[in-house]
């Protein structure tokens, strides 16, 4: 049965009163900071610039510093850092000199989870959407979960929230193997793909073993929820010595989807569960990859005793996550308009899934992609895959690689990608010079009825709102909030 609402014992971290976040504006950091603020801790943080995220935290009482300086950390009882922070950072150096503990963000998340019934969502792709769906369904089921998500949940207007129930739903980050800090009661593995391989010394077997180790952080009475459609997840399944539930499209899955149909943004399917009546479900998200995300959610909600009615309501009422196939609106062009979509996908598997979703939901429309590769190392490691999947667009514009702190790698840049895609003979990509304005470049290429997709994890994320405001697209119609 679903638990009733009750006051949740809050974590007490002994002598810790003031918590300082180095890089507080980061998507993985700000959510934890917001939860800690709501728990009554003093929170400070530094970042390189003011942003809506830092302004939001400041409005909740956080002290925000612009720039990294030693004095920012002077009064902290603990520093929280992400893997993106250089160990030579002056705030980190000061903390170490003064014997102030410096902990990774995942360790702080683990501390919050230690006092709760933790649900941790891991996997190379789909973490943010699955975590968000879980938050929506748990809320619909009468629970009030705490959640920490790697994207802005549209309905809540934030990526984190302190709830009153015993549940904490959070993403588990494999990029730096920090998810090994977490000790959840329930863990999801959506898929395992080659990404962040520097963390695993280029050894895919090491990556797989780390996922198994993560699942063994579950207690013997916990639950591992695993996608049977993913070949690598299927491969590691026999090694997992914890209770498991599988999901997918395949017949062997404990929870599976059949009769999938998609029209535009809406996807409908039937869910089969062992010893349960079939469940008819609709989600306002395109693509089979989102069906899988919904199945993981249904598996956990069913196990936690949430009613079928609440599951259906939570999924159908889900309003999406920022930059996960986010429809911004319609851009006017000669003879009609173009649907403008923003998406965070930055791995070939994610790009392919979105292209497939567009082809399934809007089969008669052209797809124009503005893509920005993220990191030179990822571009190098997955070069052939990028060439193949990006070549499936109808029109392709490539921005220069977003370095994310990396130095350029010869042959792993967007000019070379353009050349390789052009050699395939399917289309002629357009290279966008760094700093060039997009609107004058893209407008002549658009036709009425097109879908314009701005995709990637770098500063490409700012293009969609810029296009909506561009004088060249005067009269653009903003997508209405659901």
From Swiss-Prot:
One of its GO terms (cellular component) is cytoplasm. Keywords: ATP-binding, Cell cycle, Cell division, Cell shape, Cell wall biogenesis/degradation, Cytoplasm, Ligase, Nucleotide-binding, Peptidoglycan synthesis. The keyword Cell cycle applies. InterPro entries: Mur-like_cat_sf, Mur_ligase_C, Mur_ligase_C_dom_sf, Mur_ligase_cen, Mur_ligase_N, MurCDEF_pg_biosynth, UDP-N-AcMur_Ala_ligase_MurC. ATP binds at residues 123-129. It is an enzyme of class 6 (ligase). It comes from Pseudomonas putida (strain W619). This is UDP-N-acetylmuramate--L-alanine ligase. Pathway: Cell wall biogenesis; peptidoglycan biosynthesis. It holds the Pfam family Mur_ligase_C. Its EC number is 6.3.2.8. One of its GO terms (biological process) is regulation of cell shape. Its main location: cytoplasm. Cell wall formation. Belongs to the MurCDEF family. It comes from the Bacteria. The keyword Ligase applies. It is found in: Cytoplasm. It catalyses: UDP-N-acetyl-alpha-D-muramate + L-alanine + ATP = UDP-N-acetyl-alpha-D-muramoyl-L-alanine + ADP + phosphate + H(+).
């Amino acid at each position: 049965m679903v638990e009733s609402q009750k006051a949740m014992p809050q974590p007490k971290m002994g002598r810790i009163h003031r918590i300082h976040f180095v890089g507080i504006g980061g998507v993985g950091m700000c959510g934890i900071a917001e939860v800690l603020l709501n728990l009554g801790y003093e929170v400070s943080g530094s970042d390189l610039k003011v942003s809506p995220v830092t302004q939001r935290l400041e409005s909740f009482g956080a002290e925000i510093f612009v720039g990294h300086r030693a004095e920012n950390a002077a009064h902290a009882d603990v520093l929280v850092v992400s893997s993106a922070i250089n160990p030579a950072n002056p705030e980190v150096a000061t903390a170490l000199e003064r014997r102030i503990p410096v902990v990774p963000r995942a360790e702080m998340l683990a501390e919050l989870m230690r006092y709760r019934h933790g649900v941790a969502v891991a996997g190379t792709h789909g973490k943010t959407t699955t975590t968000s769906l879980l938050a929506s369904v748990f809320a619909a089921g009468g629970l009030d979960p705490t959640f920490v998500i790697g994207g802005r949940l549209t309905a809540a207007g934030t990526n984190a929230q302190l709830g009153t129930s015993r549940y904490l739903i959070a993403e588990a980050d494999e990029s730096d193997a920090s998810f090994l800090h977490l000790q959840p009661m329930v863990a999801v593995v959506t898929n395992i793909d080659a990404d962040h391989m520097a963390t695993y010394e280029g050894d895919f077997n090491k990556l797989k073993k780390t996922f198994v180790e993560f699942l063994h952080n579950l207690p013997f009475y916990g639950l591992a929820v695993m996608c049977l459609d993913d070949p690598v997840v299927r491969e590691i399944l026999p090694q997992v010595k914890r209770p498991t539930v599988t999901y997918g499209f395949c017949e062997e899955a404990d929870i599976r989807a059949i009769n999938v149909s998609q029209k535009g943004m809406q996807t409908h399917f039937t869910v089969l569960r062992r010893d349960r009546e079939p469940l008819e479900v609709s989600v306002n998200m395109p693509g089979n990859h989102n069906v899988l995300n919904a199945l993981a959610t249904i598996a956990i909600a069913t196990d936690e005793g949430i009613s079928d009615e609440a599951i259906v309501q939570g999924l159908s009422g889900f309003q999406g996550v920022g930059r996960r196939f986010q429809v911004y609106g319609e851009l006017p062009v000669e003879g009609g308009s173009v649907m403008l979509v923003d998406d965070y996908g930055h791995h070939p598997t994610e790009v392919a899934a979105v292209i497939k979703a567009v082809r399934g939901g809007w089969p008669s429309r052209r797809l124009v992609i503005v893509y920005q590769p993220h990191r030179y190392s990822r571009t190098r490691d997955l070069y052939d895959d990028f060439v193949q999947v990006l070549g499936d667009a109808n029109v392709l514009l490539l921005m220069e690689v977003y370095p994310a702190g990396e130095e350029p790698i010869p042959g792993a840049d967007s000019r070379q990608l353009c050349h390789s895609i052009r050699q395939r003979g399917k289309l002629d990509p357009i290279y966008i010079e760094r700093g060039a304005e997009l609107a004058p470049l893209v407008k002549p290429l658009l036709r009425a009825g097109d879908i314009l997709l701005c995709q990637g994890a770098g500063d490409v994320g700012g293009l969609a709102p810029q296009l909506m405001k561009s004088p060249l697209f005067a009269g653009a119609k903003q997508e209405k909030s659901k």
